[in-house]
Amino acid sequence: MRAINKFLITVCIALLASVAVALGDGEETGEAEEFKVIDHSKVWEEKGITKYEGSKTCIQCHEDKVRQFFHSYHYQLFSENEGINGKTMIFGGKMAFNDYCMAMFVNNGTKVVNWIGYITLKKAPEGYEDLVGSFTGLTGCSMCHGVGMGLPPSPQESEEQLGNIDCLACHAKPDVYVSGVLGIKLGLKNVTKDDQGRWRYVINVPTEELAKSIINRPQSKNCLACHAFSGGGPHLKRPNIAPDLLNPELAAEFDVHFKAGLGCTDCHSGENHEFGTNSVDTWSREGEGAEVQQLPH
């Protein structure tokens, strides 16, 4: 019996090793390259698109996908949750208050607290910028939350709201453009004021580069540009999802999933723009998370 068990264990290890080799190294963090680049240069030229302005640009061809994402947790910041004190209720980050970022909205998600603007640290601590994931400029909660172009999300559809989504936060090759904290720090996404005096985001990447870099599904660096800084900085809210994961070598040492060649969307697939999760530290309950066994590896 021991001989049989040893044989089975050896076979399993060999199979796992072969799977890891087959997955190969991805572009950024060791994940498999299972995405496709869809060059939009020709279609943007045909439609006279000379500037990427979020979903205002994309809705011309992808209205159904824009509406899908508009109603998602990533944009609205709330979803229907079951099992809260035995009840089903609408809740999410839009209504919440915590010790990290305090509150984005008050009055049950109806009044904005600090959505967008621009502040800098007058006197940053010595060596501050050398810390992984640190930065001296802040643009408010919208820097990560809402995946938008600057306007606070509204549950009511309107032309302005449907044009307020930053589609390329997830659908651009991350070596060309990322959103979130990382995008702000790298100067890829800046704040300005529109003709009504409202703060808005503008993308500081040449349009022709963006058009050639559109991908069909997010890569892990797209996700980490926001999620690695949850709570306002590195290792604050979720020590297991940190800027270290942006470095392929550190990621392999830090996380078993990245080491095995997995990426975020291998489990959180984003089908219909719903990124399933059952984590106890998030309110998002849209879609189904990947089924995880007791010994999944």
Swiss-Prot record:
Ranges that cross the membrane: none
Species per Swiss-Prot/TrEMBL record: Archaeoglobus fulgidus (strain ATCC 49558 / DSM 4304 / JCM 9628 / NBRC 100126 / VC-16)
Binding site for heme 1: 58, 61-62
Residues the record lists as binding heme 2: 141, 144-145
Residues at which heme 3 binds: 167, 170-171
PROSITE patterns (UniProt xref): MULTIHEME_CYTC
Keyword presence, Metal-binding: yes
Signal peptide: 1-24
Sorted UniProt keywords: Electron transport, Heme, Iron, Metal-binding, Signal, Transport
Name of the protein in its database record: Uncharacterized protein AF_1237
Residues involved in heme 5 binding: 264, 267-268
Ligand binding (heme 4): 223, 226-227
Post-translational modification: Binds 5 heme groups per subunit.
Any one Gene Ontology molecular-function term assigned to this protein's record: oxidoreductase activity
Region (Disordered): 277-297
